[in-house]
Amino acid sequence: ILIIHYNIKTHFIFKLITKLDINYLFSLVNVVPSNIEANKNINYKKILSLKALARIFSNRIIGFLKRYFQKIKSPNYLLAGGLKSLKSPQASIINNSTKIIWTHTYDFDEYLLNNKKKDNDIIHAIKNNFAVFIDAPSPLIKHDALIPGISSPLTANVYFPSLCKFFDKIEKRLNIEVIIAAHPRSNHLNRPEYFGKRRVFKHMTIDLIKKCKLVINRNSTAINFAVLYSKPIIFHTSKQISNHFSMTHQIYSMANLLDKVPINIDALENIDWNNQLNINKKLYVNYSNQYIKNPKSKNKYLWDIVIREIND
């Protein structure tokens, strides 16, 4: 079972599988929005550097050529999530003999589990009138899970003051408390200064999103939970982010698919805050179908589906 992507760095693994003629399952359940056609209002000339172009060329073009000319063995099974799984460049590794198993993202497993359990005491004690900010690794951890091998453009001394002003605006205009859903890899204390002494909860992201009135996001795929629970989402960007191709691309890809325009936290004038609470239900359903779960796949746990399909 391979949950790694094919690229220049992982080529040797696929080459070894081919040499030893090993049967394998290739996973593409967590495809994220990144289509160029989904992006609007981005100044590509400003942010698309030679380094970014070189990275795209090496991972996609050279990777494809290596697979083609060196005859990399195709997987016996492809584990697919949303309908966009087969549109991913990684899907070019399959052939006509590959059996496609339609399932869903790992987030949907967590969604199924969460719907079966009762609120814990902490969640039960939190008042419903709150917005939840989905924390990300950077800038405290100098990388971002969605941009592997690339340093985050954010610096704590610039990002956090602007973020807190953003939270202040939301709390004042929408009469709502902002609380923090800590990233699993973070080490925040409760009510840290850099979050404006706001409450922080760890390992409770889905619980908080399920109960909140509004989700605040940068480029986290945890918006899957917001989509599944039909929660309004505010996306944000910043001056530092706007000069970084990968992060800008991810934020706008997600936002545009839900008919949202990211708010620049360094320019908070002339914002219709009440409009931020609106959602387009058709786009939410489409997002779920394309990136979370094939509408025809079963509402079963991912590996239960896989085991049954392989055994049939």
Which functions belong to the PLM regions below?
Residues 9-13, 34-36, 85-89, 141, ...:
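Short, charged/polar "capping" segments at the starts of alpha-helices
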Residues 102-108, 112-113, 164, 176-229, ...:
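Donor nucleotide-activated moiety binding/catalytic core segment of transferases
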Residues 1-114, 222-223:
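Active-site and donor-binding regions of nucleotide-sugar-utilizing enzymes
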